[in-house]
Each structure stands twice: as C-alpha cells, then as structure tokens.
Amino acid sequence: MAEAAPQDAQQNFAIQRIFLKDVSFEAPNSPVMFQKEWNPDVKLDLDTQSRELGEGVYEIVLRLTVTVKNEEETAFLCEVQQGGIFTAEKMEAGQLAHCLGAFCPNILFPYARETISSLVVKGTFPQLNLAPVNFDALFMNYLQQQAQQGEAEA
C-alpha cells in the first residue's frame, strides 16, 4: 500500500480578504458632456503589484484605470485599486509567480470591474461593462519579455 504524502507537503491556497484599496472618479467636463452625442473612446490600463506580508501570505493589488473620451474631450476617468490578501504556501517558484501574477488578478478583476461600472452609472454616464481580461496571456507575455531582456543582456 502506497503511503500518502505528508500533510505539510501539500500546497495551500486561500483567499483571506478582498478589499477596495483606492478609488477615484472624475468627470471634468460635466455637465457639458451630457449634452453631446455619445460616441465614447474607451482606454483601459491595468497593472498588478504583489508583496509578501508574511511567510506564505501575499497582498496583490490590481489597478485599473479607465479613461473615456467623447469627441476628443475626457468624459470621465476612473481608477480602482482592488486588493486581496492570499495565502499561497508550498508552491515552487514558477507556480507561485503564476499564482500571484495571473491567478490572483483573475480573482480580483470582477470586483474591480463591478466597482468601475457602479461609479460610471453614479456619474450618470451609460453603463460600462469591461470585457474579461486574460491574465494568463498577459503573464506569459511578461515572462517572454523578461526572457528576451535576459538574452539581450547576455
């Protein structure tokens, strides 16, 4: 009979907390913007940051900045920093990097998207539904860029 792996060798992942770290909404050209025909140009910038809070405990912050222009004028600017505290223990380095750089942001994104949508509606603009983001693909692109930079420096 095969022995089970020791309990302390098992990987552990858990969500400890999801929280709103920072939020900003600006509509610099209101109320004039409400009188114009609505043909928005939406720009989304996103970034993630991670830091270790303790052994196996990490804070991940997903920052989304949405800038919407209408007829070349800024209709609104919305920035949300959605944070999470996660336990990620007993993972190899590559797996931990993927967890912190892609898996955790995937968990945080729906919360940030909902906050942005709510702020936009409260600003009395048409609802903004952000498309899903493929954080796995973004993380893979990041790894490829890091590898190319390493080759260029060598």
Swiss-Prot record:
Entry keyword Transferase: no
Q: Which GO terms of type biological process are on file?
A: protein folding; protein tetramerization; protein transport
Q: Which UniProt keywords apply?
A: Chaperone, Cytoplasm, Protein transport, Translocation, Transport
For this protein, the record's NCBIfam families field holds:
PRK05751.1-4, secB
PANTHER family attached here? PROTEIN-EXPORT PROTEIN SECB, PTHR36918
Q: Record the organism.
A: Vibrio campbellii (strain ATCC BAA-1116)
Q: What gene is this protein translated from?
A: secB
Cellular component, GO annotation: cytoplasm
Q: What name is this protein filed under? A: Protein-export protein SecB
Q: Outline the subunit composition.
A: Homotetramer, a dimer of dimers. One homotetramer interacts with 1 SecA dimer.
Q: What the protein does? A: One of the proteins required for the normal export of preproteins out of the cell cytoplasm. It is a molecular chaperone that binds to a subset of precursor proteins, maintaining them in a translocation-competent state. It also specifically binds to its receptor SecA.
- What terms describe the molecular function in GO for this protein? unfolded protein binding
Where found?
Cytoplasm
Q: Tell me the lineage of the source organism.
A: Bacteria, Pseudomonadati, Pseudomonadota, Gammaproteobacteria, Vibrionales
Keyword Chaperone attributed: yes
Protein family per UniProt: Belongs to the SecB family.
